[in-house]
Curated annotation (Swiss-Prot):
This is UPF0434 protein Smed_3047. The lineage of its organism: Bacteria, Pseudomonadati, Pseudomonadota, Alphaproteobacteria, Hyphomicrobiales. PANTHER family: PROTEIN PREY, MITOCHONDRIAL, ZGC:162634. Pfam families: Trm112p. GO terms for cellular component: cytosol. InterPro entries: Trm112-like (IPR005651). Disulfide bonds: none annotated.
Length: 62
């Protein structure tokens, strides 16, 4: 894991949902992203702040 990567507070992770599906998110520490498996999107975390904009999310390819 990158030393500069931030950790996500588990309580925050319980509150945040995918803006598209309203489903749960999981934290990917290697990519420092919040992942919506249902929407197949990964939301970046920049300077410790989750960017919960669909337009900023990375599409997850299989």
């Amino acid at each position: 894991m990158d030393v500069n990567a931030s950790k996500v507070d588990p309580k925050l992770l319980e509150l945040l949902v995918c803006p598209l599906t309203k489903g749960r998110l999981s934290y990917d520490p290697e990519a420092n992203e919040l992942v919506s498996e249902k929407a197949r999107l990964a939301y970046p975390i920049r300077d410790g702040v989750p960017i919960m904009l669909i337009s900023e999310a990375r599409k997850i390819e299989e």
